[in-house]
Amino acid sequence: MHVTIEQAEKAIQAARAKAVELGTQMCIAIVDSGGNLKAFHRMDGAWVGSIDIAQKKAKTAVFFGMKTGQIGALSQPGGSLYGIEHSNQGLITFPGGIPIVDADGEMSGAIGVSGSSVENDDAVALAGASAIGDTELPDHPWRT
């Protein structure tokens, strides 16, 4: 099942509240389980460059079913996914993209956030994703 527009809006509200708490301006993207943009919010003052980054973080998280920071760890020189960021018309392999997992353990979409440090981006994304679901997929053979 895909994330609904109501869920996407709730996730954006929670993410925006966390960004305000941290004193930063963010771009927040929600994609469905197919990686298609469902909702987007650009806070006043958020960088223009963060528009694309937020969307790519969300797509990366949904394409691989894991947090973008985890992909980043695997894509370092010598890593099993080295160079992966050049596939799929550009992926983002640093923190700020998180899968959204529904009550049945299925990925319904993902959130991507950009506009501050990767630590803040990740915290804001986690706040948004956690507002509507879980952030970890159950173990699958292809993820071990």
Swiss-Prot record:
One of its GO terms (cellular component) is cytoplasm. Disruption phenotype: In the absence of formaldehyde, the absence of EfgA does not impact growth or viability. In the presence of high formaldehyde concentrations, disruption of the gene allows growth when compared to wild-type strain. Mutants also exhibit increased formaldehyde resistance in the presence of other growth substrates such as succinate and methanol. However, mutants experience formaldehyde stress/damage as a result of not arresting growth. They have a delayed and muted response to formaldehyde and exhibit signs of proteotoxic and genotoxic stress. Global transcription response is also affected. Pfam families: HbpS-like. InterPro entries: GlcG_carb_metab_protein, PduO/GlcC-like, PduO/GlcC-like_sf. Keywords: Cytoplasm, Stress response. The keyword Cytoplasm applies. Induction: Up-regulated in response to formaldehyde. Expression is probably regulated by TtmR. Formaldehyde binds at residues 57, 114, 121. It is found in: Cytoplasm. The keyword Cytoplasm applies. It comes from the Bacteria. Formaldehyde sensor that plays an important role in endogenous formaldehyde stress response. Directly binds formaldehyde and causes rapid growth arrest and cessation of translation in response to elevated levels of formaldehyde, a potent toxin generated by methylotrophs as an obligate central intermediate of single-carbon metabolism. Translational arrest protects cells from formaldehyde-induced protein damage. Also contributes directly or indirectly to the transcriptional formaldehyde stress response. Required for optimal transition to methylotrophy. Homotetramer. Heterologous expression of EfgA in Escherichia coli increases formaldehyde resistance, indicating that EfgA-mediated formaldehyde protection is transferable to non-methylotrophs. This is Formaldehyde-sensing protein EfgA. It comes from Methylorubrum extorquens (strain PA1) (Methylobacterium extorquens). The gene is efgA.
